[in-house]
Amino acid sequence: MAVSRFTGKTLNRLAFEPLGTKEKVWFTISDEPNEKYLLKMSRPNTGEHWSEYIACQLCVLLGIPCAEYEILPCETAESHVKRMAVVSANLIENGFMMIMGNEFLFQRFPEKYPTPEESKNSREKRHTVSMVKESLTSVLIKPAWNFPDYFMAFDVFCGYLLLDTLISNQDRHHENWAVLYEECSQLYYLCETYDHAASLGRELTPEKRHILLTSKDKGQQLSTFVNKARSELFEYETDKKPLLTIDALKLALSYQDNNVKTYWINKINYLTEYEIQEILNKIKDEIMDKETKEFVLRMILENKKRILENVN
């Protein structure tokens, strides 16, 4: 089920996580004292908890390496008020260090990319698809991911952009991807994708969702709405706006062999409405109501249609 196995357990707080804009805290539980977990609070009146969970489950279906998320209702100081959160395991194994995209790009291209201190803003025009591709040239992928032998790190990253297009994720900025550095071997590995809360229209009001599903005005329809989704990746650093999610995906795949595109398009083609509905059915109605589930289902299917029509 979507609700976390940690429900009802006492969490032993370790430290706050400073990265990002949301409330986050690292914790352990008595059953697993050596395992660290990250609890990320959902902001009030948003669906950040269910959008994160749904994105994770879609990754499982598509074979995209992803941080695993579970929904956790949390008690607050006011006993009658519950806050929603998601819980994920620590992605950094012993002997590894996580390097965020902005820091890694600066390490690779110190003459081209700003320092992490200079690039605090999530929107950085030098965060281009081609620069990300070039930076990942010598980065490995984990054998446990079971990709075809010809797959390289950027081929997997194309899968991350496929996910972004499918869920209208508009937050693939340069701190929302990372590599893992193994200290003993001095090798770099691509990190699993993470942080997909800014997706699936989680910020929309029920009224807005209803309009998008029922309006006869093309400008107010779901197909028009999803066409506006933008990535935080650019084609050229002189561009005024970042790429649309579909264009970031198309550009990334255009750099790769055709068999990489075929691999990912087949994954999308085989994704069924039934499988998506099953993900939504695992979320209790008090966490995500039926109308919102219907909207999210239609949104994912609309994005699937866009991918199949535009990536060829």
Identify the function of each model-found stretch.
Residues 1-120:
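Conserved ATP-binding subdomain of kinase catalytic cores across diverse folds
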Residues 42-49, 147-148, 152, 156, ...:
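Short, charged/polar micro-motifs that form catalytic or ligand-binding hotspots
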Residues 50, 171-174, 204:
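Short glycine/proline-enriched turns and hinge-like loops at secondary-structure junctions
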Residues 60, 182-312:
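C-terminal catalytic region of ATP-dependent kinase domains
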Residues 68-77, 173-183, 312:
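Short alpha-helical "patches" and their helix-cap loops
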Residues 92-161, 184, 274, 281-286:
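ATP-dependent phospho-/nucleotidyl transfer catalytic cores
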Residues 155-198, 300:
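Active-site acidic catalytic loop and adjacent metal/ATP-binding pocket
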